[in-house]
Amino acid sequence: MRFLRCLYIFLMALFATSVAQEIPAPSCPMILNYTDKNLPHHGTLKNSNGFVYVDLDDEYIHKLITFIQQDGFEEPPYFGDPGLVGAHITVMYPEEATKYGVKEIRECGEMVSFVPKKCQVVHPPRWKEIDEVYFIVVDAPQLDQIRKKYGLPKREHDFHITIGVKPKMAKAA
């Protein structure tokens, strides 16, 4: 009986830890409603030096950020310099193109459709100066097919549109 109790406590602690890592996505119903009624659910597949992405209407960021600014989110750093791509859905990173020998994506220039599904907020482990990233998860089977066609594995993370970032607060000295 003691073993079962210990196992129960262990499983509850494990479950509580995984749930605690989830961050609520504020204003998600309003954001999804706005995207459904006001923004296109398609973009153009593009390639910028091995970075393959779906180029989207920049209103995905410029309009939707207004729903989450009061929560400390800012526009992601996708604008300003000529090499920045604005609102997008990442399909393939340059490192993947190199690793899997992808030279050319024949589908570039084609329209890609997607369906916004849900909102998520995550702590990005590799983006050191950013505390949280707010994005819209999208369903885009065409993008899975493209990755498969060029020999890439299924993505580790869902296809998504980043609409906001929350910078880490500087610690007081």
Predicted features, each with a name:
Residues R2-I9:
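Sec-dependent signal peptide recognition
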